[in-house]
A protein has these predicted regions:
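Conserved class I S-adenosyl-L-methionine
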Residues: 1-45
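Class I SAM-dependent methyltransferase "Motif I" SAM/SAH-binding loop
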Residues: 53-55
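Class I SAM-dependent methyltransferase SAM/SAH-binding core
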Residues: 57-113
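A short acidic, Gly/Pro-enriched loop at the edge of an enzyme's catalytic core
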Residues: 115-122
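A conserved beta-strand element that flanks and buttresses the S-adenosyl-L-methionine
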Residues: 124-126
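A short glycine-rich, Lys/Arg-flanked "PGG" loop and its adjoining helix->strand segment in the class I
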Residues: 139-151
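SAM-dependent methyltransferase
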Residues: 156-215
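C-terminal lobe and adjacent flexible extensions of AdoMet/dcAdoMet transferase-like proteins
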Residues: 215, 219-247
Length: 247
């Protein structure tokens, strides 16, 4: 029997499948909005938020709807195209056409290596996207983020703390399943989305929240909040949101 062809999850049709599953996932969103509301200095009110690995806008759109101005970046042109379509669709359905588009600038950028002359009141790296990066790339992402923050600005990063080992498969919907293959010794995690006869893969790294905390400390950022939420679908998984402030 022939093995199924594994296509990338974040490009082509995979990007559309990912968006279809993630669009209604509100994990982290309330915490991120609460963090911005409670921890941002009023002195930074005129500055924008930089979002890394924004994908199809799962976090971008709620931040914009809350009144924030955002530079939304991602390395996947396909994901950014989905985001642009969503912005246009939501704008056309409101009484204030163009309102979201005025608050969101969409730009292609690599989260592990970027440089903007603009300084931001917050840099947001949600959806455990940091797990797509190896150790060197992760350090690059955090260093670039720290440089991009205005004094007093916030770095908001999410990851997964995982104690499980081996392979787990969960059914998301009839005909749609997610398989996770974990290798704790190598620090690797492979996610395979099966959508009918289609298969999409994402090769990830295990990035414990302690690693991010230590890296932030070395960059002279102060951890001000840590939220851990057990994953109800995956055993021995917890989603962690870390918030660090630049002096």
């Amino acid at each position: 029997m022939r093995s199924p062809v594994l296509s990338p999850l974040y490009s082509g049709l995979g990007a559309q499948r990912y968006h279809a599953l993630s669009a209604h996932d509100d994990t982290e969103i309330a915490l991120i909005l609460e963090t911005l509301e409670n921890h941002l200095s009023p002195d930074l009110a005129d500055l924008r938020i930089l979002e890394l690995a924004c994908g199809s806008g799962r976090v971008t759109l709620p931040m914009a709807e809350a009144g924030y101005r955002i530079l939304a970046t991602d390395l996947s042109p396909d994901m950014l195209e989905v985001l642009r379509s969503r912005i246009a669709e939501q704008d056309s359905a409101t009484d204030a056409p163009g309102d979201l588009a005025a608050r969101i600038e969409v730009q292609e950028a690599d989260m592990s290596s970027f440089s903007f002359t603009e300084r931001f009141k917050a840099v947001c790296l949600p959806t455990a996207s940091i797990t797509q990066l190896d150790a060197e790339q992760r350090l690059g992402a955090l260093e670039c983020s720290a440089r991009s923050l205005a004094p007093g600005g916030l770095l908001i990063v999410s990851t997964d703390d995982i104690a499980a080992e081996g392979t787990t498969t969960i059914e998301i919907q009839p005909g749609i399943s997610l398989t996770e293959e974990l290798d704790q010794a190598r620090g690797r995690r492979r996610s395979i989305l099966r959508w009918g006869e289609e298969c999409y893969v994402s090769e990830l790294h295990l990035v414990p929240s302690s690693w991010i905390s230590e890296a932030c400390t070395r960059l002279r950022l102060t951890i001000v909040e840590r939220h851990s939420t057990p994953d109800q679908a995956m055993p021995d998984h917890s989603g962690v949101l870390l918030v660090a402030r630049k002096p």
